């Protein structure tokens, strides 16, 4: 169960009306001297009556009741008593740890930092840390985040008078708190986020990682998180912590039934007919305790017969083994800095953002025009994982894709390319060995139809240099770059900055190139720094969340394409762009209709079967080890109605087909809800079969602009209180979600009624970078993610589930295009009428690229290996 200190609705829950609805924005505004900042974006409504009904009568699975029922006013009072019980080791252990180690913990938090505690309480625990910080003379701003003003006032009223520590309240949900931390005035402040009381144990394990990952994204390189985790694996000790000899815990649990009756408005549960069953369940992940209601006899509740042997789950508390804690941190993009434990049963873990964790928030991932040295270090950490851990030594000289150089080329190409650009702009001598520029400057990208046709490239040696020599050279170039940052990023001239920026984005793009090459090899090693996903579980969850793929009317609108970045500019704060991103221009795009999400693996498989196409996309494989052609598929035209449901794929096909991932082959049955990635020619045939076509470059940009407008419109409505976000999910495992499930609402599908023309005034392209929050880019997952729950939402830039997006537009020279001086052949070499523009980004695309609205990528239309998907559009 959560600790009293971490409860959010708190005493506010005692005011729940009999209807089960309580609008927390109507809390009494009590007079208080407490400094409480209202950060709520919208009034929050908790409809427990609906939750009770839906969980008591589930469509599938066992009966449950929302854990939030336990935390009305009386429940909080009872739980406060529980935290003082000898058996309840969680609070006692945490206090012992803080008493002994608070001074050491405080040493990790610098003066001038802010501390944000997720949930407020009686300060019994956090005061120990605040006192240590105050004694150290550190100026600290402490913020207690809670959804209840009354709870914040009560908490802050108990704060002792500190000399250096200032205490504040944040009134809002966890989501509100995260948005507050994302604000420009807060995002760059040093911070430490506290999540005490082992409240993380009330989440399912996958949800716990998702929750933490949300806050990881707002952490800077020097920020920290301090998280309490229950690791007790003594069954008796765990059991008695939740089943005390005095019986207070069972009284606390039974009080939930009394609260349910008040909310329902009738005596649905007769208290005397129910008892509490607590049980400890052992598993290799660390075990858990769970609590149930069980009737003492057969009884009727809300028209349902509940047998005496039936049970209704109300609460669970997961325990974490050392291995599971490490899995949790790595999945959430965190690394452990230090830990303090009480024996083997409880620990406080100090965590920092992993070097490979790329933020999806524009004010973080693009906080300066030039990537920072921290950005470079994160990039190098990722590059080194791919090249030194996943790429076997014996595979370096192989060509997983025959149209590309051997893998070893890319090890030398990345530092050589950067060194060449630095040499051009600094006028200094190249790094040694200088002859590397002859063999590593530029790779090959030949014509798929005729590989003899290829742009100018470096000579291919008879024998590549030894790996050790290449890695030494790599470190030499990295050291050279670090030297340019030695006097501060603001002192780097614009022309040298452009060379650094070009080298940075060049390396970003080649990580993806190397990875999609490695995906074609059965010798690629699984990344070990993150846990292997449970693809079966992920598939079952995706299937349960499917919604129809709706059509949206994209209104006629004028959009901006490109950015302003003069080659001879001197403003170091202006963002850089490649030659194909310039000059900026306005274009008119006619109205059309677009589906909300891209084509999935399942839809593509149905297309193959119905059209009797044997050729699989290169992203798939046959499990019977048949050879897979590396050629291109025959184009297929035709029309097929876009049905919301189709016949099920035959088991014989599913059993023999898999999708390629860095984790090896994943059975197609586990990846049906993923976006398919294939060549343009392959997907164009599928789009025609589905009753549409692939959008043009301008139409795709128009989709992104309109998707942004819809988001802003929805956010404006939230500000006005028209929509209802959920409350803090730390309160319960199943009763309350962090983010409410999607439902067709303001984003009305075109079939019924499209947003009015007046909504087009909301469309804006003044911001260069997109907020990618929730997008599967930037290595937040190392594989595509299910996308079928997004059909009722118009997905925007980078939001296609981990794939780029094809457009039907050929890459051609446009008016005003000028080749860039540093790399004149970057785009110009591909004006051959064979390449189409792609937009967005994949799961392996850095946010600086995936989120930049002006960025343009391209591939040959029949190139089968790139991670590019497509959505279907149609004319009005």
Curated annotation (Swiss-Prot):
L-histidine binds at residues 88, 202, 242, 315-317. GO terms for molecular function: hercynylcysteine sulfoxide synthase activity; L-histidine N(alpha)-methyltransferase activity; metal ion binding. One of its GO terms (cellular component) is nucleus. Residues 378-874 are annotated as: Hercynylcysteine S-oxide synthase. Residues 631-650, 732-761 are annotated as: Disordered. Ergothioneine (EGT) exhibits antioxidant, anti-inflammatory and cytoprotective properties, leading to its growing application in the pharmaceutical and cosmetic industries. Also shows UV and gamma radiation protection activities. Finally it acts as a cation chelator and a regulator of glycolytic metabolism. It catalyses: L-histidine + 3 S-adenosyl-L-methionine = hercynine + 3 S-adenosyl-L-homocysteine + 3 H(+); hercynine + L-cysteine + O2 = S-(hercyn-2-yl)-L-cysteine S-oxide + H2O. It comes from the Eukaryota. It is found in: Cytoplasm; Nucleus. Residues 744-758 have a biased composition (Low complexity). Its main location: cytoplasm. Binds 1 Fe(2+) ion per monomer. S-adenosyl-L-methionine binds at residues 119, 125, 146. Fe cation binds at residues 413, 506, 510. Disruption phenotype: Does not produce ergothioneine in either conidia nor mycelia. Keywords: Cytoplasm, Iron, Metal-binding, Methyltransferase, Nucleus, Oxidoreductase, S-adenosyl-L-methionine, Transferase. Gene3D superfamilies: paralog of FGE (formylglycine-generating enzyme), Vaccinia Virus protein VP39. Its EC number is 2.1.1.44, 1.21.3.10. Its cofactor is Fe(2+). PANTHER family: ERGOTHIONEINE BIOSYNTHESIS PROTEIN 1. Catalyzes the SAM-dependent triple methylation of the alpha-amino group of histidine to form hercynine and subsequent conjugation with cysteine and oxygen to form hercynylcysteine sulfoxide, the first two steps in the biosynthesis pathway of ergothioneine. Ergothioneine is an unusual thio-histidine betaine amino acid that acts as an antioxidant against peroxide in conidia and contributes to conidial longevity. In the N-terminal section; belongs to the methyltransferase superfamily. EgtD family. In the C-terminal section; belongs to the EgtB family. This is Ergothioneine biosynthesis protein 1. The gene is egt-1.
